[in-house]
C-alpha cells in the first residue's frame, strides 16, 4: 500500500493537501483504497487475504471511529447522550478485541452498573456500535448484546394535577407562563416548544417538526373558523412581544429567545416559591408534589387530559396509541361507584 499527496491549485483553498491510498496488484494495476487510513488498511487486508489489523479490531479504535463518523450525524441531544454512554463503556471495553465480546460480558456489565436505566442505554449504544463494526468489516460475529436481558424500567408516572399547576403558574414569570401554556396546548417536548416561531404559523396551523423523531405535525389554531385556545394564546403572545424583533414565540422580557437554561432557571424559581407558599400554609403533601413537578411533566399532563386516546397520540406525534397510553397517560380510568 502506498499513499499519494495532491495539492490544491484552487485560489479558494491554496496549499490544501489531499492524501489518497492505493494498492498495486500482481499485474501492476492501481486500486484506490480511499482517503481514510483506517479504511485503507482494512481494504488492504481484504485484498491481501490477511487478518484485519489488530489495533483496528480493538473496541477503542471502533469507539473512536463511531464517535468520528456516526455520532455527528445524529441530533444534538442524541450526540450528547451517545458520547456520555461511550465514555462510560470505555473503561470496561476499550482494550477488548471486538471478537472477544460475549453475551456473558454484556450481562456482567449490566449487573455491575448501579445506574440501572443508564446501563440499558449504554448497552443499546454498544449494540449499535457493534452493528456498525459488522458493516465496516471488522467482525463477522453475531451481536453479543442481542438476547441479553435489560434492566426493568418503570415509566415516570407523576401527574401534575390542577392544585400543583395553579400554584406554580401563579409564581411564574410572564415568559414562563407562556412556555407552560404553549407546552400544555401543543403537547410537545420542552426542546420543541422553545424553538417554535411566528413563521411556523401557516394557513391556520402551527407547524411542528419534532426534533427527537423528526415527526411533522400541523396543530390547528381554529375550530370551526373561530380561534381555539392555542390560536388565542399565540395571538396574545404576539401582541405582548410585538416590540421585539425575535421570531421565536417564547422570549424573555428583553426580547431574547428563551434558552433551555433560562427556562430551567425560571422554572426552578417558580417551583421553589410555590413550595414555600405551600409549606407556609401547612400543606406538606402539596409542597412535596410541587417539588416533584418537572417541566417535562406538562406533556403527559396534556396527554392525560385529552379524552380520546387517538387524539392524544396524534398530538404527541405517536404512531401507536399504546405508547401514549403506557407512558404518557398518567390518570386512571374513570369508574362508576358501586351505588
Where are the language model's segments positioned?
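C-terminal catalytic core of tyrosine-transesterase DNA break-rejoin enzymes
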Residues: 117, 177-181, 185, 191-192, ...
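Basic, Lys/Arg- and aromatic-enriched nucleic-acid-binding interface segment
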Residues: 116, 120-122, 135, 139-140, ...
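N-terminal DNA-binding module of tyrosine recombinases/phage integrases
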Residues: 13-104, 243
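N-terminal core-binding DNA-recognition domain of tyrosine site-specific recombinases/integrases
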Residues: 32, 68-132, 138, 257-262, ...
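C-terminal catalytic core of Y-nucleophile DNA break-rejoin enzymes
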Residues: 32, 213-235, 245-269
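Short basic/aromatic active-site micro-motif
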Residues: 101, 260, 280-307, 323
